[in-house]
Amino acid sequence: MSEYKLTPWSLADLFPSSDGPEIEAAFTELEAMASDFEAYRQKLTPDIDFEDFMDAIKAVEKATQAAHILGTYPGLWFAADTQSQDAQTLYARVQQFMAQVENQTLFFSLWWKELADQKAEALMSRSDGYRYWLEEMRHFKPHTLSEAEEKVINIKDVNGKHAQVTLYDSITNRYVFKVEVDGEEKEMTRGQLTVLVQGSDPDLRKAAYQELYRIYADDGPILGQMYQTLIRDWRSENIDLRSYAAPISARNLVNDLPDEVVDILLDLSEKNADIFQRYFKYKAKLLGLDKLRRYDIYAPVAEADKTYDFDRAVNLTLSAFEDFDPRVAELAKKVFDDGHIDSEGR
């Protein structure tokens, strides 16, 4: 049995390389799918034939699968190395291309949302596994704009909020944190610092926590402006243009949750805040503290007396999955064996 080691993930199962012909072929193939799909526009009438309807759905499904593969590669590459100019360039190119493809195929979802309820139900009743997807699409009808407006928003998002998030990741992932450990100053990534934030040493927890926010505070005005930009964009689109009842309503609909359900959850959480407060008091007692500090929220209540290397930790995890369900363990093991875990510290 091979030993599991801390390694970056392999993306070879998506594409062999970032600059190989396979990626360019994927762009060409998806572009052709989008162009071919436009032929369905003239078939989308109130009296559409069921076979034509299912052909259109399967064409959307095939294009969506291809788009996910093409979009996942640069997304994972960028997530693993946010400072790579090549990763950023490909990521931006794919996002722009996806907006173009979405705009070419947008007419299908707009037509489907506008179709009369009786006709839509007749088609959904025969659509088997596609029914939930079709129903969900129609729930967005009251908040859908014209085709021209939706196209503008797709383009706006690429160069607006998506670009802001990419910029935020690029800025914050270059941060280096410095903490004194055992009398020696060490440089750490955020992931490494988080171990100290959640560690058993109260002084190290405090030092790590303060260092985390010291570094972020240096860029506070910049990060704050980016956050405000995203908030304004969300409100302008979802309240002013799409007419949602509240900013959270747009997210609730995406999550297939009625506003009333989320409101009840929030209301009950507020009314029972004392449960959370009692938990903090009890944890402070377990830690031997008069009052829980901000640095102690994630502190373990007992010191760990064992350490495990990565290989041992993986095998313990797989063993637990095996006890739960052998099939789950098999799938989890495949993720590790295929190099789909990005475990390298950096």
Which residues make up each language-model segment?
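A well-structured
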Residues: 1-320, 324
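Long, charged, glycine-rich C-terminal linkers/tails
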Residues: 294-297, 328-346
